[in-house]
């Protein structure tokens, strides 16, 4: 049986909703404490980061709301909890910066992506400020105008 290949880019999953809902100000790279069955599921890209966030408690960071679906071939004597809280590994300096920023009004810490870094699984977390509804509409308008501009440039090149 052939082995499953890792994603060539290294990215396992992304949280696109977080980029839509928050102005991302700072990004951090954190290690994840995982069980064996979770690593196998991540190799098969069976993870969802939508609605996942980082909880800062007692000088530690915890990933909440991340759903890792267990494989059907996983062990039967290990009870797999797909939505359990997973510990994030960060430096003390990074934890202090996150804690002080999250205590300010309007800031949140969310998970952006899970990816491979050599043989380790890392989680990119970000410190962001929540967008209002009009901010989201403004971003969408900008994206649409950029798309229109790109279309115009491409069609002009084809006409020549």
Curated annotation (Swiss-Prot):
Span list, region Disordered: 131-160
Question: Where, per UniProt, does this protein localize?
Answer: Cytoplasm
Checking Pfam families in the record gives: SmpB (PF01668)
PROSITE patterns xref list: SSRP (PS01317)
Gene Ontology CC terms, in alphabetical order = cytosol
Q: What are the recorded Gene Ontology BP terms?
A: trans-translation
Q: Which CDD domains match?
A: SmpB
Q: What does this protein do?
A: Required for rescue of stalled ribosomes mediated by trans-translation. Binds to transfer-messenger RNA (tmRNA), required for stable association of tmRNA with ribosomes. tmRNA and SmpB together mimic tRNA shape, replacing the anticodon stem-loop with SmpB. tmRNA is encoded by the ssrA gene; the 2 termini fold to resemble tRNA(Ala) and it encodes a 'tag peptide', a short internal open reading frame. During trans-translation Ala-aminoacylated tmRNA acts like a tRNA, entering the A-site of stalled ribosomes, displacing the stalled mRNA.
**Family recorded in the similarity comment:** Belongs to the SmpB family.
Q: What is this protein called?
A: SsrA-binding protein
What is the organism field in this record?
Pseudomonas savastanoi pv. phaseolicola (strain 1448A / Race 6) (Pseudomonas syringae pv. phaseolicola (strain 1448A / Race 6))
| Gene behind the chain | smpB
């Amino acid at each position: 049986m052939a082995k499953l290949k890792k994603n060539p880019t290294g990215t396992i999953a992304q949280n696109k909703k977080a980029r839509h809902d928050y102005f991302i100000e700072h990004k951090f790279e954190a290690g994840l404490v995982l069980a064996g069955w979770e690593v196998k599921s991540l190799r098969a890209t069976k993870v969802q980061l939508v609605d996942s966030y980082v909880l800062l408690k007692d000088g530690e960071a915890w990933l909440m709301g991340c759903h890792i679906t267990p494989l059907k071939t996983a062990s039967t004597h290990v009870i797999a909890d797909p939505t359990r809280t997973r510990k994030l590994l960060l430096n003390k300096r990074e934890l202090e910066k996150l804690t002080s920023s999250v205590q300010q009004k309007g800031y949140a810490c969310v998970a952006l992506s899970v990816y491979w870094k050599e043989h380790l699984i890392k989680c990119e977390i970000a410190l962001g400020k929540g967008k209002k509804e009009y901010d989201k509409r403004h971003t969408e308008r900008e994206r649409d105008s950029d798309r229109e501009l790109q279309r115009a440039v491409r069609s002009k090149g084809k006409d020549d």
